[in-house]
C-alpha cells in the first residue's frame, strides 16, 4: 500500500495545477510541515544556497502572480510572430503571453539567491569578486541543484498531504524582487484542488487569447497544453528497466 501511495503522490506532483480553490486556507500544521520539508532538503555539505520566502497573504500572492506574464503561446507555424532574438536575449511578443496561474495558489514559496555556511574550497572562491567564470558557473550550478532538490521534495510532500502543486521559473525578476527583496530564482505554488480540469487557466478565457490559440468557446476558460515525459532507464548499464523489472 505504501508504494502505491508514494507513486500516486509522484503522479500528482508531476502534473501541475493551473487553478486552485482560493476560498480555503492551508492549516498551520501542514504549512509547518511544508516549510520544514523545503529547508531541510539535502545540499552540498549542508551549505545554505537559497533563502525561502513564504506567502499566504492573498494580496501578496496576487502581486507575485502579476509578475508572471511570461507563459508563451506559440507553435512552429507562428514562431516568428512570437520571438525575436536580440543581444540582450530572446524577447517574446507580450500579445502571445499569459500569466502563470500555477502559482495563484493558497501558499507560495519563492526561492531566492543566498550564500551562507560555505565550506567547500570552490564555493568560497566563487563567492569572491575576482572568481573565474568557470568557478562561478560551477557554484551557480550547485546552488541550482539545491533549489531543485528542495522544490522537488516540497512538491512531493505537498502531494502526499493532499494538495496540488505548480512551478514557475519565468517571471519579471525586477518586479518580483521588489516584493521578495532578494533575487528570486523559482516559485512554487501549493493549494487545494478546484474540482475542475487542472489545465484550465483560473482567470483567462478563450476570448482573451489570439484566435489561433483558443481551446474552446469564447466564454470557456483557456486550457494550457500538457505534455508527456519520455525517459529511458537502464539497470547496470545494460538491462532495460521496462522489460527487466528487478
Question: Could you say what each language-model-derived stretch is?
Answer:
Residues 1-118, 222-246:
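N-terminal amphipathic, basic helical "cap/leader" segment at the start of enzyme domains
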Residues 200-226:
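Alpha-helical transmembrane segments and their immediate juxtamembrane flanks
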Residues 43-46, 157, 196:
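Short glycine/serine/proline-enriched coil/turn segments at secondary-structure junctions
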Residues 34, 38-39, 109, 115-177:
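Small-aliphatic-rich amphipathic alpha-helix that forms the alpha element of a beta-alpha
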Residues 105-107, 161, 184-188:
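Generic beta-strand structural signal
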Residues 47-50, 163, 185:
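Short secondary-structure junction motifs
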Amino acid at each position: 500500500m505504501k508504494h502505491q501511495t508514494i507513486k500516486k503522490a509522484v503522479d500528482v506532483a508531476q502534473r501541475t495545477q493551473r487553478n486552485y480553490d482560493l476560498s480555503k486556507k492551508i492549516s498551520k500544521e501542514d504549512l509547518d510541515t511544508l516549510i520544514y520539508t523545503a529547508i531541510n532538503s539535502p545540499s552540498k555539505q549542508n551549505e545554505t544556497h537559497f533563502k525561502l520566502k513564504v506567502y499566504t497573504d492573498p494580496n501578496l500572492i496576487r502581486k507575485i502572480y502579476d509578475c508572471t506574464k511570461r507563459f508563451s503561446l506559440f507553435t512552429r507555424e507562428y514562431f516568428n510572430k512570437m520571438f525575436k532574438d536580440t543581444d540582450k536575449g530572446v524577447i517574446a511578443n507580450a500579445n502571445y503571453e499569459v500569466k502563470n496561474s500555477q502559482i495563484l495558489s493558497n501558499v507560495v514559496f519563492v526561492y531566492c539567491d543566498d550564500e551562507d555556511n560555505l565550506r567547500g574550497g570552490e564555493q568560497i572562491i566563487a563567492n569572491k569578486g575576482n572568481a573565474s567564470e568557470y568557478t562561478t558557473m560551477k557554484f551557480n550550478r550547485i546552488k541550482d541543484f539545491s533549489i531543485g532538490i528542495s522544490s522537488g521534495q516540497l512538491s512531493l510532500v505537498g502531494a502526499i498531504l493532499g494538495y496540488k502543486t505548480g512551478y514557475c521559473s519565468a517571471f519579471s525578476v525586477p518586479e518580483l524582487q521588489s516584493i521578495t527583496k532578494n533575487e528570486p530564482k523559482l516559485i512554487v505554488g501549493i493549494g487545494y484542488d478546484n474540482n475542475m480540469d487542472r489545465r484550465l487557466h483560473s482567470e483567462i478565457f478563450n476570448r482573451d487569447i489570439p484566435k489561433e490559440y483558443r481551446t474552446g468557446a469564447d466564454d470557456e476558460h483557456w486550457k494550457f497544453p500538457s505534455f508527456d515525459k519520455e525517459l529511458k532507464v537502464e539497470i547496470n548499464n545494460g538491462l532495460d528497466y521496462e522489460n527487466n523489472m528487478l
